[in-house]
């Protein structure tokens, strides 16, 4: 990936999300891991978000680096996430990574699935 200004990125990676990934990688003692976000069919609204840690970047993957950690998105998922933001929250309901997706026309109550 070439360097781009953050406001021109197809997907943003917040400071909160990057900081949490950095903490988790330190706990795992594996700096090769990257946070991968993906979209699959399913959930109550048609599509759902998934998050996993991955050591590799595949050909065609889009990456964003912040605070020394990487967010990775495959090209198929990226088309549903353009203009979105991967964030992290911790509160009374628990802690989680989530996607703010301007392309989602509807989302389920928990925010884990969406339709376009």
UniProtKB/Swiss-Prot annotation:
Organism listed in the record: Shewanella loihica (strain ATCC BAA-1088 / PV-4)
Cellular component annotations (GO), alphabetically ordered: cytosol
GO biological process: iron-sulfur cluster assembly
Name of the protein described by the UniProt record: Iron-sulfur cluster insertion protein ErpA
Keyword Glycoprotein: no
GO MF annotation, one: iron ion binding
Residues holding iron-sulfur cluster: 44, 108, 110
Lineage: Bacteria, Pseudomonadati, Pseudomonadota, Gammaproteobacteria, Alteromonadales
Cofactor: iron-sulfur cluster
Domain of life: Bacteria
InterPro entries: FeS_biogenesis, FeS_cluster_insertion, FeS_cluster_insertion_CS, FeS_cluster_insertion_RrpA, HesB-like_dom_sf
